[in-house]
Swiss-Prot record:
GO terms for molecular function: tryptophan synthase activity. NCBIfam families: trpA (TIGR00262). Transmembrane segments: none annotated. The active site is at E49 (proton acceptor), D60 (proton acceptor). This is Tryptophan synthase alpha chain. It comes from Albidiferax ferrireducens (strain ATCC BAA-621 / DSM 15236 / T118) (Rhodoferax ferrireducens). Tetramer of two alpha and two beta chains. Disulfide bonds: none annotated. Pathway: Amino-acid biosynthesis; L-tryptophan biosynthesis; L-tryptophan from chorismate: step 5/5.
Length: 273
């Protein structure tokens, strides 16, 4: 059983829901990420999604795009992201870490670090660094069977997005290769956009669960404790990204961790009560 699966199983046994914060690696300061990840855990995070900066992030709204641009300008790439996870693991061997990003940085890493043995350098190095799962936004499930098999052999989960527009056929395709959890994108559009229709989310989750056996996390549009509580009543996990990025942007360095931790404590309390 993977670290992600163990985490969800433990939460289910306690009747609790997973809190999954997201941050772009290297934002808002290039060397703050491991420290910020520990602040997330202190605030009640169960899983951490770490965004890999990319120059053309098609699913990301302006808030996360800006964070990615800032991280890229500071020289943050896949090598640095894996180093951050490795550093985090020196003090935390239990909190699952998921890398979220796009195919291009993964493929570039494989090309640059090719071992000429037919195996994915990214998968092997991610596993060695302490990564638990991977969510590649632009990898369609019908083309992912070989990648999923490589990840599984290395002990990593492959996580997919589902959307309000996802058909039953797409859900079945995702179910064949997904592990860990699936991430339901509760809004049409990009991250941080629009108001969340909690009723629509509640109506969609039984459809997803009819096809998908892994836990279902919900993200996009969750900005406060009240919304998180409502979503937590129907989902297995609540994912929050853009709001965290907004809160820590422009904070002085010594306030980044405390501000994020305080916000997550509020969300955690709402989910648990």
């Amino acid at each position: 059983m993977s670290r992600i699966a163990r985490t969800f199983a433990g939460l289910k046994a306690q009747g609790r829901k997973a809190l999954i914060p997201y941050v772009t690696a290297g934002f808002p300061f290039p060397d703050i990420t491991p420290e910020l990840m520990h602040a997330f855990v202190a605030g009640g995070a169960d899983v951490i999604e770490l965004g890999v900066p990319f120059s053309d992030p098609s699913a990301d709204g302006p808030v996360i795009q800006k964070a990615g641009d800032k991280a890229l300008a500071a020289g943050i790439g896949m090598v640095q992201v894996l180093d951050m996870v490795r550093t985090f693991r020196t003090r935390d061997a239990s909190t699952p870490v998921v890398l979220m990003g796009y195919a291009n940085p993964v493929e570039r890493y494989n090309q640059k670090h090719d071992r000429h043995d037919g195996k994915s350098a990214f998968v092997l190095d991610a596993a060695a660094a302490g990564v638990d799962g991977v969510l590649i936004v632009d990898y369609p499930p019908e083309e992912c069977e070989a990648f999923a098999a490589e990840l599984k052999s290395a002990g990593l989960d492959l996580i997919f997005l589902l959307a309000p527009t996802s058909t039953d056929e797409r859900m079945q395709q995702v179910a064949r290769v997904a592990s860990g959890y699936v991430y339901y994108v509760s809004l049409k559009g990009v991250t941080g956009s629009g108001a969340l229709d909690t009723g629509a989310v509640e109506a969609m989750l039984p459809r997803i669960r009819a096809h998908v056996q892994v836990p279902v996390g919900v993200g996009f549009g969750i900005r406060d404790a009240a919304t998180a509580r409502t979503i937590g009543q129907v989902a297995d996990a609540v994912v929050i990204g853009s709001k965290i990025i907004q809160l820590i942007d422009e904070q002085p360095r010594d306030q980044v961790g405390p501000v994020a931790q305080k916000f997550l404590c509020e969300i955690r309390t709402a989910l648990d009560n």
